[in-house]
Amino acid sequence: MAPKNKFTKEEMVEAALRVVREKGMEGLSAKSMASALGTSTQPDFTAFGSMAGIKQAVYDAAVRVYDSYTEKGLREQIPFFGVGIQYIRFAREEPALYRLLFLTQKQVPSYGAMDAMLHLQERVRPTLVQIYRITPEEADVYFRDLWLVVHSLATLIVTGDCPYSDREIGSILTGFSLSICKAIKEVPGFAAGTFDPDAVFRALVGK
């Protein structure tokens, strides 16, 4: 039997990540990894325990790639808007990894699309409170609602069905941002969900 090639864990994870970017997690196998590593022999998975172990390592690597995008957004002058733009950029530039993390059944019980949203919500809450002069509870509602729009746009991008340019997406996000902020500021009980939507709409259409 031919000896198995020796590669570092980092080299194997990078090779596996290349496979996933091209073929998705379902395309990851010993054969596809060998091809990505440029060898004709099966890689030695001892360091990972099994193929399941390397799949977990690839998932963790995908999370790190995603985190690098959101960290850039958090360093922008307006962090919560920067995070939204970077989230969409991640979907556009890393569609396979976006699909793995956010459009498939959870690989890790504590990490999925909603978990990612809650983590970012916590990070941007202080900035929202400071800039918009709203309460932490109102800031959470604002970010949640805007994030749902961002996630929808990102999903359209990944599925190849988004007709909007980056400029148009920026305008869409600005419009929703303004609408949500105005509702929080001017509709009593909006953030708490205790307002009367029928009364609010009647007042709006009656103007």
Q: Where are the language model's segments positioned?
A:
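Amphipathic alpha-helical linker/stalk segments
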Residues: Q56, D60-V83, L120-I131
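Alpha-helical DNA-contacting segments of helix-turn-helix folds
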Residues: V20, A52-A62, T70, L101, ...
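C-terminal peripheral helix-coil segments that are non-catalytic and often amphipathic
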Residues: P126-Q130, P163-K207
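Helix-turn-helix
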Residues: E11, A15, V19-G53, A57
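Helical hydrophobic small-molecule/effector-binding pocket
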Residues: F81-L103, S110-M117, W147-A154
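Amphipathic alpha-helical packing segments from all-alpha helical-bundle domains
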Residues: V108-R133, D140-D145, H151, T155, ...
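Short, hydrophobic secondary-structure boundary micro-motifs
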Residues: S29, R99-F102, S110, T159, ...
